């Protein structure tokens, strides 16, 4: 995997940096693990915009990812590493000894031909999935469950990883990349190692059109709107907002706490620090 700076043959390519991975499979994805994915353009069933800046983009299929990894004791072999347009991480197509194929998140250093295993008897090896109670303290993990059997929810993005800090009774403490420390049940499953494609954060899109291919529409600043459209709008000439930054609906938009899930607050040992 390498970072390639594109020659400035046009304004859109000036400054563009691509992530090139020669090991990615160049054919079509495995048809048995594809599902239809329809566009919403950010609208709900009434046609009202519920999420701004979404629309257009290339047609995509959803790749069904196995986030539960419950085929215990059956060895699997990595057939190929693929690009997935639905996430920043790459995915791996694995073939189990019983003939079933599944997509999983590709770990750092994973290559075609690697042997993987799920379950409590699996060795501590990058790409293997097992309960946290069987993973040594200090191990870097990803695809961590928050509830036993629910499937991986934490550390699924490119380059992500959490560190197993301690085990106490039926719970373990894991440190997330944000610095937050959470309690997780020891029966929750996690995959050993970091998520691959960490260079994804170093790429530079280069032009607005590349974001339109991804289905992202422009974001217009509130200060250039009219007062009817945004609280920051209006004024003669170029003027400041005249107030603390707010959303188009008047809610504070920088730094306001939005978390309201009190049910799981007890699972947070320490909140993330300010950057």
From Swiss-Prot:
Transmembrane segments: none annotated. This is Large ribosomal subunit protein uL2. Belongs to the universal ribosomal protein uL2 family. It comes from the Bacteria. InterPro entries: NA-bd_OB-fold, Rib_uL2_dom2, Ribosomal_uL2, Ribosomal_uL2_bac/org-type, Ribosomal_uL2_C, Ribosomal_uL2_CS, Ribosomal_uL2_dom3, Ribosomal_uL2_RNA-bd_dom. Part of the 50S ribosomal subunit. Forms a bridge to the 30S subunit in the 70S ribosome. The keyword Ribosomal protein applies. One of the primary rRNA binding proteins. Required for association of the 30S and 50S subunits to form the 70S ribosome, for tRNA binding and peptide bond formation. It has been suggested to have peptidyltransferase activity; this is somewhat controversial. Makes several contacts with the 16S rRNA in the 70S ribosome. Residues 224-275 are annotated as: Disordered. GO terms for cellular component: large ribosomal subunit. One of its GO terms (molecular function) is rRNA binding. HAMAP family: Ribosomal_uL2_B (MF_01320_B). GO terms for biological process: cytoplasmic translation. Keywords: Ribonucleoprotein, Ribosomal protein, RNA-binding, rRNA-binding. The keyword Metal-binding does not apply.
């Amino acid at each position: 995997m390498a970072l390639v700076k594109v020659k400035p043959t046009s304004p859109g390519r000036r400054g563009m940096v691509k992530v090139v991975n020669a090991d990615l499979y160049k054919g079509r994805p495995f048809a048995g693990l594809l599902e239809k994915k329809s566009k919403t353009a950010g609208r709900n069933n009434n046609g009202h915009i519920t999420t701004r800046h979404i629309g257009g983009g290339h047609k995509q299929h959803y790749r069904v990812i196995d986030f539960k990894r419950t085929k215990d004791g059956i060895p699997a072999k990595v057939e190929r590493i693929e690009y997935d347009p639905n996430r920043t991480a790459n995915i791996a197509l694995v073939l189990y000894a019983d003939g079933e194929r599944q997509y999983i998140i590709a770990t750092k250093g994973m290559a075609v031909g690697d042997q993987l295993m799920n379950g409590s008897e699996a060795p501590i090896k990058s790409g293997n999935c097992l309960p946290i109670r069987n993973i040594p303290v200090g191990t870097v993990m990803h695809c961590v469950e928050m509830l036993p059997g629910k499937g991986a929810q934490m550390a699924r993005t490119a380059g992500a990883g959490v560190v197993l800090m301690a085990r106490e009774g039926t719970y373990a403490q894991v440190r997330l990349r944000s610095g937050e420390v959470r309690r997780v049940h020891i029966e929750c499953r996690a995959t050993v190692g970091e998520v691959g494609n960490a260079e994804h954060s170093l790429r530079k899109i280069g032009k607005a059109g590349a974001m339109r291919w991804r289905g992202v529409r422009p974001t217009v600043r509130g200060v250039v709107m009219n007062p009817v459209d945004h609280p920051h709008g209006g004024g003669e000439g170029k003027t400041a907002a005249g107030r603390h930054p707010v959303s188009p609906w008047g809610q504070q938009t920088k730094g306001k706490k939005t978390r309201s899930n009190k049910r799981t607050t007890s699972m947070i040992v320490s909140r993330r620090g300010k950057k």
